[in-house]
């Protein structure tokens, strides 16, 4: 019997939780280990400044490992610690397979109650991370973090007490600071002060959001204001000071057809230091369709525009399609491709066009 798309999506979340192995469970304490190894073989082509480039690769695709410890106090109260790593290329050396180093992606603690919500502190996802509905495995054409940061060093509150509704708010703190002063400070280090935030990195920010996903309806919206550190020694014109951004999604599931259609969008206004402000927006219709049991077809299109008053204008059109298939409850294979074209217009220069095409075949093994 054919499953509905809603059941598949719920099943996907359940499967991701089931992939974790419970290594300890006693007296209200539960410890889980899990993760995945993911490999992709890809071919990419790009045209930048009329120069064509082409390369193929076999590389790691966001392989990860996580550990989660949950302690239940009773009466619905709990505390949780979570650590998730990523495999990435070494900072030094020439390896490009992304298997060089292990880094910390998320690390946070949570205090919560099933009825009243939870407070999360540490390096974690924000409410903006789950707002849009577009599906992708590797070549996602949406750049949500350009509009609102989707993760960082944060204090966050999330409420899930109403079925299908998630409410959240996050306060972002600086995550990248000079470790040393003087010339040892690195970029801009001549006048660096130990402990100061790196120029053009997040200084602080706030965001709020809500998402509803029930009764075949998906609706979500998030707003964020993010402040960026200016160099206290070099007053460069055009450096961003603040970004006010919004993200939204609206979708509907045709359960009998196994089809989800959605429309994602975003808007941002960037305030630059003693320079003209920049405005950005995008719209992105998309779909997810169940071809057969354990096989899904998905895609989305994006139109994005960045503009400066009486200045440079940039337009990007991008499209993505993919098919994934579950060989086993813990084995997923997929093929995905994306194409993007960017046109840049400046009053004093000729129009510039850049193109990029990518296609990849991937395999994920969960544990």
From Swiss-Prot:
GO terms for cellular component: cell outer membrane; pore complex. GO terms for molecular function: porin activity. It is a multi-pass membrane protein. Belongs to the Gram-negative porin family. It is found in: Cell outer membrane. Homotrimer. SUPFAM superfamilies: Porins (SSF56935). One of its GO terms (biological process) is monoatomic ion transport. Forms pores that allow passive diffusion of small molecules across the outer membrane. Pfam families: Porin_4. This is Outer membrane protein P2. It comes from the Bacteria. Its main location: membrane. InterPro entries: Gram-neg_bact_OMP (IPR050298), Gram_neg_porin_domain (IPR033900), Porin_dom_sf (IPR023614). Keywords: Cell outer membrane, Ion transport, Membrane, Porin, Signal, Transmembrane, Transmembrane beta strand, Transport. Residues 1-20 form the signal peptide.
């Amino acid at each position: 019997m054919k499953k509905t798309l809603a059941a598949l999506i719920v099943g996907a979340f359940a499967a991701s939780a089931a992939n974790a192995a419970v290594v300890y469970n006693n007296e209200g304490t539960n410890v889980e280990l899990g993760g995945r190894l993911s490999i992709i073989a890809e071919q990419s082509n790009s045209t930048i400044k009329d120069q064509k480039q082409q390369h193929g690769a076999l590389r790691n695709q966001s392989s990860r490992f996580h550990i989660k410890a949950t302690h239940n106090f009773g009466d619905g109260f709990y505390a949780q610690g979570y650590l998730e790593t990523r495999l990435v290329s070494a900072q030094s050396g020439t390896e490009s397979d992304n298997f060089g180093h292990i880094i910390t992606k998320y690390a946070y603690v949570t205090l919560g109650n099933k009825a009243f919500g939870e407070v999360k502190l540490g390096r974690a996802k924000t409410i903006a991370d789950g707002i849009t509905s577009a599906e992708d495995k590797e070549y996602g054409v949406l750049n949500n973090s350009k509009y609102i940061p989707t993760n960082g060093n944060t204090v966050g509150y999330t409420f899930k007490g109403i079925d299908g509704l998630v409410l959240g708010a996050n306060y972002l703190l600086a995550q990248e600071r000079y470790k040393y002063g003087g010339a040892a400070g690195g970029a801009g280090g001549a006048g660096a002060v130990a402990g100061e935030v790196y120029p053009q990195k997040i200084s602080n920010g706030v965001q709020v959001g809500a998402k509803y996903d029930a009764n075949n309806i998906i609706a979500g919206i998030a707003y964020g204001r993010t402040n960026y550190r200016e160099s206290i020694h070099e007053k460069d014109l055009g450096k961003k000071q603040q970004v006010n951004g919004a993200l939204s999604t609206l979708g509907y599931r045709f359960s009998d057809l196994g089809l989800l259609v959605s429309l994602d969008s975003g808007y941002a206004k960037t305030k630059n230091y003693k320079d003209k402000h920049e405005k950005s927006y995008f719209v992105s219709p998309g779909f997810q369709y169940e071809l057969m049991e354990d096989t899904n077809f998905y895609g989305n299109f994006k139109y994005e525009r960045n503009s400066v008053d009486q200045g440079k204008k940039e337009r990007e059109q991008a499209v993505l399609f993919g098919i994934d298939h579950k060989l086993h409850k813990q084995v997923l294979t997929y093929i995905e491709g994306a194409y993007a074209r960017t046109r840049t217009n400046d009053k004093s220069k000729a129009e510039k066009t850049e193109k990029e095409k990518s296609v990849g075949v991937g395999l994920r093994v969960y544990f």
